[in-house]
Amino acid sequence: LVKCLALAVMLALYSFSGGLHSLLVLSLLVGMMATMAQDIVPAAAILSPAGQQGKIVGTVMTGLLLGILLSRSVSGVISAAFGWRVMYQLAAASIALTGLVLWRVLPRFETHATLSYPALLHSMGGLWKRYPTLRGAAMAQGFLSIGFSAFWSMLAVMLAAQFHMGSAVAGAFGLAGAAGALAAPLSGALSDRFGPARVTQLGSLLVMLSFAAMFALPLLSPSMQLLLIALAAVGFDLGLQSSLVAHQTLVYSLEPKARGRLNALLFTGVFVGMALGSLLGSKAWALGGWPAVVALATLAGGVALVIRLTQKVRPTEIAAQQAAQ
């Protein structure tokens, strides 16, 4: 709730800022406070009934990914009609309203950690060393995020260069990706039934195949190329979201009392992957255009699949997990 209030204030200040330096500082602060979205996920896991954690976490993550995908469309329309400052003011109001709703509906639950904040940060290193499953999940999801970010960061550039379309059209492709994200609760239910490890493998495979399908773009007419890009967006967003929900189910089971820290470590991999994807995507575009971006995304999905297929749970990890519980 404190982050919610702080984020609303930062977004409001951002809308009135005019200098480059103040925008940079406020961008940093907005990014720090926006991590409140990740605080909701372990809370949902804690409140989930036994046997339904995957489904419920999947539902929460659907909202999170839909926000990411649809933000392009919504911000593009509002900014074009009213200016970018209005978009930030509306965002500030929506976050303030979200905080009010959370304050009214979220129950109070006990904290498991009694350590100081520096000690909590230090303990995260121990969690990282103790659980190979956590390391594998963070790395696999990080590589999937590289492909995701490379695609979305360069899509508008490609559409402008090859189809002479504006950023609003690129934002509309987010609607296609949102269709894939809507299936996340189903993937959560499948994790509960068949095990999250299998879902991560299938999700990574779907991401790789969806990106690889775009190698066929030069063989198609312009209208069919756009259709294939939209279908690929549905496919890899579904695969990425399914893998993310399953990875969360995996890591939350390692040490239930440390779910918040485990989630932070998992999403460190996600955010590092997002940043690398934007950087590498622009480099790939400069070197070889859209085919190079597709190759990068396909390779990233393939690496994630290899990680998921080759990782096994070690006896020492099982012992550590049982001791923690």
Positions of the model-derived regions?
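Structural signature of the two symmetry-related core transmembrane helices
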Residues: 1-12, 92, 199-213
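C-terminal transmembrane helical hairpin of 12-TM major facilitator-type secondary transporters
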Residues: 198-246
